[in-house]
């Protein structure tokens, strides 16, 4: 789904290139070295010749159904909490506020659901 989405139009392509560039900078900040993928960024700077121009569309939500929602950012935050929290780490960064807040809310909802918290 993501490869189809990025080829849909130049705005999606630009967004993904900028996201990739930011990820490379973040990797260098956290680990003090350059990711091997970074050597490809200059090759990917220019749009593919046959890509159409168009307005940005939200990236596909490639995740379990229970994480999906109308807001793509919120859906991916939920996905990280449900599916990735057991091994998520933030080297040289504070844990994002959204992660702590949503994780606390999710734990409360799960406890209510399985009967640990009574009304």
What are these regions (language model features)?
Residues 1-119:
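Sequence termini and other peripheral, non-core segments
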């Amino acid at each position: 789904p993501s490869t189809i989405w990025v080829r849909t139009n130049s705005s999606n392509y630009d967004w993904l290139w900028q996201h990739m560039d930011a990820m490379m900078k973040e990797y260098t900040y956290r680990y003090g070295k350059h990711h091997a993928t970074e050597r490809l960024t200059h090759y990917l700077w220019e749009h593919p010749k046959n890509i159409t121009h168009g307005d940005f569309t939200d990236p596909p939500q490639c995740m379990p159904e229970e994480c999906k929602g109308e807001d793509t950012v919120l859906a991916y935050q939920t996905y990280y909490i449900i599916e990735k929290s057991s091994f998520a780490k933030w080297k040289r960064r504070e844990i994002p506020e959204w992660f702590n807040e949503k994780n606390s809310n999710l734990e409360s909802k799960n406890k209510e659901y399985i009967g640990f918290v009574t009304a």
